Amino acid sequence: YCKKCLPDHQRILFSGDGYSDEWPVEAEKRGLANNKTTADALPAFVSDKAIALFEETGVLTKAEAQCRYDCKLEKYNKLMNIEATTMVREARRTYRPVITAYATKVAKGLETIRAAGAEAAMQCEQNTLNKLCNGITTINDSIKALDAVHQKAEALDGQEQANVYAHEVVPAMDTLRAAVDAL
């Protein structure tokens, strides 16, 4: 059976890695969509082409497909809301206070070193303190930016909300994550 089926379907098989740089090129060559986010992919579920296929094969009616789309969209939006809310809360309540406390210890240590007159050690501690202070500023700015786009998303609903989550909130979350990870 495989000997017969494989040659018939070889042209649709892709033996590469779907996450590699080869896939977008291959997808375009085959005329396939290459949606990078859930928000970009979900509308395809209720496209005219998909609805026609579902109804023709008796898999779903238009109303059933729309209902599934609405449920998936709502689930995505709720999940992204939870993730963004949690990230802001954790950054404010956990990471920023710990980093600030450490910066305070470094600053006190720097004063002790300065009082002892150890110039060589002072520069190292000063560099550490500068890095921490700059990092705290970056984290604060990132929290504010994430908060702003998260509020923007919360004011919307449906597909518009999903698009803001995918294209504005997620990148803001990535920026905050990078700022915290850098310290």
Task: Give a label for each model feature.
Residues 1-183:
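Acidic, glycine-enriched catalytic cores built around paired aspartates
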